Amino acid sequence: MDSWNMKGSKMVDVNEITKYLPGFNCGACGYKRCDLFAEALLNKDVKLEDCPFLLRERFKENYEKLKEILKIKGKIKKEEKYIGVIDGYEADFLLKPLPNECSCRETLLIMDKKELKVGDYIRYRPLGCPIPHFAKIIDEYHGFYIIHVVGPSHRITGEKIEYKDVGIAIVVAFEGIVEGKVPEVGKTVKFIPKHCMMQKVHSGVVVQVEGKRVYIEGIDLKVF
């Protein structure tokens, strides 16, 4: 669906351009991904013809559509800024849960020797965070636990759930959907998990990207 500003003028953003590109992320245009090429098109740093696939018969309609879109001048949609509430730092993007999930997936290193299994509910405090968390274990992998944060909202609803207290845990990874510009693999990024109670900026290194789905390791709350 096309976007319009308050005066009825058409808005153009990276997503509108990207959906008409071939989507091969082949790098032939000089950019690693099609969305990066789309951004360069909007900034007029490249030409459509720099993508060799757009010149093929298969993508003829896409090529013509993109030419029409790129005729719109001076209406490029500005990227939204994501600012942490606690420290006021600017994040690169907001990290949202995977479809039909209640929170981003987090991978924990739990030092407590309690016997834990998938389906258990745990109470813990992430290293460096002053707020106790409540979570459900959804998977286990080589001594790491993948969880969904589910509380402390249960204290408001009055829901009675038995939790195992495991003390301090180290958050080693996040997985979720990017709202904003998708980062490249290997980049150090600053992000805000949408479910974070403090809305604090986190940092980490992107190790996997699939569309807008990203996996980030080396999580740290110290951001400069």
Curated annotation (Swiss-Prot):
Alphabetized InterPro entries for the sequence: 4Fe-4S_dom (IPR007202), ACDS_complex_subunit (IPR051069), Dihydropteroate_synth-like_sf (IPR011005)
Key words of the record: 4Fe-4S, Iron, Iron-sulfur, Metal-binding
Domain of life where this protein originates: Archaea
Chain residues that bind [4Fe-4S] cluster: 26, 29, 34, 51
Domain (4Fe-4S): residue spans on this chain: 9-68
A molecular function (GO) term: 4 iron, 4 sulfur cluster binding
Pfam families tied to this protein: FeS
Keyword Iron-sulfur recorded: yes
Protein name: Uncharacterized protein MJ0119
Species the sequence originates in: Methanocaldococcus jannaschii (strain ATCC 43067 / DSM 2661 / JAL-1 / JCM 10045 / NBRC 100440)
Phylogenetic lineage: Archaea, Methanobacteriati, Methanobacteriota, Methanomada group, Methanococci
